[in-house]
C-alpha cells in the first residue's frame, strides 16, 4: 500500500516554521500540534482530545458544532534540558455510540485561527458489535537525527490509516527520547507530529515501555508520557495513567506497565565515560556513569492486585467474551539479537492470564513479529543458565497444541504476539536456535542485569539474558523483515463458527524495509508497501447474557 509519510513530515516542518513566525508576531505561538485522541471513560460516549503548542496557548479549546469544550493545560519542565512543554487535554463526553464527529482544535493565539485544525473521529459501538483495531509497538520518529529513529515510522503511521481501524494499540517504546537525553522534548515533538496523521482521527492507546523511563522526569521517569496522555482512570491512588482498561463491544482491553514486574534493567542508562549533566537551571546534579533507572516493583504490588480485580470482573461479566492484554515487554519472545523473554512477567501475570482465560497478549520490545501457540501453565526446570549450563526454572509457557492449523480456541490457552515492528532503525528479525538440537531457542531474564564496569575506564554495560530455553511455544516468526502491522477484526456473531465468536488476525509486513536484513545481509530502505504475511483466527465460546 502506498504512502507519502516522509514527504508529509518534511512539509509539516516547513508549515510549522511559517506558523511560528506568524504567531510570535501576535505574542506567543499557541498553534495546536501533536494532536491525538484517546478513549474517555466510556469509548461509546467519550474521547479525550490532546495536543501541545510551541508556547503557552490562550484559552485552548475544542469545538464540535456549536459546542465548545475548554481544555485543561498541563505543562511540565524536562528535567535534563530545562525546556518547558505545554500540553492540553479536552475531555469530550455526551457523544452518541457508533457516531462520527468533526472537531476543531484552536486557541486565541492560534496562528491558523482563520483556518484551524479540523479532523473527524468515530465513537465505539454500543453492545456486541463488529469492529477493527490495529497494533504495533516500538515506533520511533522519521527524524534520523535521533537515536533509533528511521523513516519507516512515517510509513507505519500511514499503514494504520490505510486500514481505517476504530483505534490503534501502541505497545510501548513510543519514541526513544531517553536515548536522546539532552533533547527529549524535541524527540517527543517529532513523534507527536508524525502520529498526528492518524492519531487525530482515531484513538491511539499506548502503554509504557522501558524507553519511557527518563532521568529526572518524575518518580518512575514517566512525566513526559503522563503529561501527554490522558488515559482511562484505574482508580488506584498515585498511579494514574500507568495502567488502565477499557471496554469496546464484547472485548475487555487491559493495558499494563511491565516495567513494574520485569527483571530486565532496560530503562534510562548512562554508559559513560562522561556523566549526563542537566542544565544548571534544573537544579539536578550530574548523573554519573554506570547509573541506570531501574523501576521494578515501583507499585508495591498495586498493579498486579488491580489486574486480578479487573480480570475477575471481566470474566464474571456475561457480556464480555474476549480479554486482550497489552504490555511492552515479553513473556514469549525468541529473539536472538533482541531482549527475549522475562521471568518476572511469567511469575506475576501469566498465572492470572491462565486463571481468567486471557485470550491474547500484545507486546513490543523485540523489533520483530512472532506468534506463540496457545499456552497454559508452565514447564518446570526447562531452562539452562547461559554461563554454567545449570538447570534454571524459567517457567516456560506450555503450549496446549503445537499444530499450526491457523485456527485456535483461546478458551484453552493464551496466544502471545510480539509486535515490536513499528519503525525503529534497529530491526531484530533474527531468532534463536539451539545448535545442539536445532530447536527454536529463547533467551530469558531470570534476574536483574544491573550495570557493570567494562575494561574501559568509566564505561559500563548491562548484560543480556542469563538463561535460555527451547522455545516449544513459538509457532511463527517473520524472518523476512522486522517491520509490520497487525490488523484485528472482531466478529461477535457466532453463526460462522458454531456458537463461537471470532477474531481474525492478519499480520502485514514491509519486506525490504530492514536497513540490513540479518538473515540475508541485503540492504533495504523505508517502504510504504505492506503485504500480507499471515492470517489466523481466534475462537472462543460466546458468553450467554441474562435475558
Where are these regions (language model features)?
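Generic N-terminal initiation segments characterized by hydrophobic and/or small/turn-forming residues
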Residues: 3-4, 92, 253, 377
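Residue-level recognition of conserved structural "scaffold" positions that shape functional pockets
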Residues: 9-12, 144, 179, 216, ...
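Metal-dependent phosphoesterase/phosphodiesterase active-site architecture
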Residues: 19-61, 86, 110-115, 140, ...
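Conserved acidic
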Residues: 1, 299, 345
Amino acid at each position: 500500500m502506498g504512502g507519502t509519510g516522509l514527504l508529509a513530515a518534511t512539509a509539516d516542518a516547513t508549515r510549522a516554521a511559517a506558523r511560528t513566525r506568524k504567531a510570535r508576531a501576535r505574542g506567543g505561538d499557541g498553534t495546536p500540534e501533536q494532536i491525538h485522541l484517546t478513549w474517555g471513560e466510556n469509548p461509546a460516549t467519550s474521547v479525550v482530545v490532546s495536543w501541545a503548542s510551541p508556547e503557552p496557548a490562550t484559552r485552548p479549546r475544542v469545538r464540535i458544532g456549536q459546542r465548545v469544550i475548554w481544555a485543561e493545560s498541563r505543562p511540565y519542565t524536562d528535567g535534563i534540558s530545562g525546556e518547558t512543554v505545554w500540553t492540553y487535554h479536552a475531555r469530550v463526553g455526551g457523544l452518541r455510540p457508533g457516531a462520527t464527529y468533526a472537531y476543531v482544535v484552536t486557541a486565541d493565539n492560534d496562528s491558523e485561527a482563520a483556518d484551524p485544525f479540523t479532523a473527524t473521529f468515530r465513537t465505539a459501538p454500543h453492545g456486541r458489535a463488529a469492529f477493527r483495531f490495529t497494533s504495533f509497538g516500538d515506533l520511533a520518529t522519521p527524524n534520523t537525527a535521533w537515536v533509533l529513529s528511521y523513516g519507516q515510522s512515517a510509513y507505519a503511521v500511514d499503514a494504520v490509516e490505510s486500514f481505517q481501524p476504530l483505534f490503534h494499540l501502541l505497545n510501548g517504546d513510543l519514541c526513544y527520547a531517553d536515548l536522546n537525553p539532552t533533547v527529549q522534548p524535541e524527540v517527543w515533538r517529532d513523534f507527536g507530529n508524525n502520529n498526528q496523521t492518524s492519531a487525530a482521527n482515531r484513538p491511539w492507546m499506548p502503554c509504557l515501555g522501558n524507553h519511557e523511563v527518563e532521568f529526572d522526569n518524575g518518580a518512575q521517569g514517566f512525566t513526559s508520557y503522563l503529561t501527554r496522555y490522558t488515559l482511562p482512570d484505574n482508580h488506584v491512588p498515585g498511579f494514574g495513567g500507568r495502567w488502565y482498561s477499557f471496554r469496546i463491544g464484547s472485548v475487555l482491553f487491559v493495558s499494563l506497565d511491565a516495567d513494574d514486574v520485569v527483571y530486565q534493567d532496560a530503562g534510562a542508562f548512562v554508559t559513560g565515560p562522561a556523566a549526563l549533566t542537566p542544565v544548571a537551571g534544573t537544579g539536578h546534579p550530574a548523573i554519573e556513569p554506570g547509573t541506570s533507572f531501574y523501576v521494578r516493583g515501583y507499585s508495591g504490588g498495586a498493579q498486579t492486585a488491580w489486574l486480578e480485580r479487573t480480570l475477575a470482573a471481566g470474566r464474571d461479566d456475561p457480556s464480555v467474551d474476549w480479554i486482550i492484554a497489552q504490555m511492552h515487554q515479553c513473556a514469549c519472545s525468541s529473539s536472538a539479537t533482541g531482549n527475549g523473554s522475562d521471568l518476572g512477567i511469567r511469575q506475576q501475570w501469566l498465572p492470572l492470564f491462565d486463571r481468567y482465560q486471557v485470550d491474547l497478549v500484545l507486546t513490543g520490545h523485540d523489533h520483530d513479529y512472532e506468534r506463540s501457540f496457545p499456552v497454559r501453565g508452565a514447564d518446570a526446570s526447562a531452562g539452562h543458565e547461559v554461563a554454567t549450563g545449570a538447570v534454571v526454572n524459567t517457567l516456560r509457557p506450555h503450549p496446549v497444541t503445537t499444530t499450526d492449523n491457523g485456527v485456535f480456541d483461546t478458551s484453552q490457552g493464551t496466544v502471545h504476539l510480539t509486535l515490536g515492528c513499528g519503525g525503529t532503525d534497529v530491526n531484530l528479525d533474527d531468532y534463536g536456535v539451539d545448535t545442539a538440537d536445532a530447536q527454536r531457542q529463547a533467551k530469558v531474564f531470570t534476574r536483574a542485569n544491573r550495570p557493570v564496569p567494562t575494561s574501559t575506564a568509566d564505561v559500563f554495560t548491562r548484560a543480556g539474558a542469563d538463561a535460555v530455553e527451547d522455545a516449544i511455544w513459538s509457532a511463527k516468526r517473520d524472518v523476512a523483515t522486522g517491520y509490520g502491522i497487525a490488523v484485528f477484526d472482531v466478529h461477535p456473531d457466532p453463526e460462522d463458527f458454531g456458537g463461537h465468536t471470532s477474531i481474525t488476525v492478519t499480520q502485514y509486513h514491509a519486506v525490504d524495509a530492514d536497513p540490513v536484513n540479518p538473515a540475508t545481509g541485503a540492504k533495504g530502505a523505508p517502504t510504504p508497501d505492506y503485504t500480507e504475511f499471515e492470517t489466523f483466527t481466534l475462537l472462543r465460546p460466546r458468553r450467554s447474557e441474562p435475558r
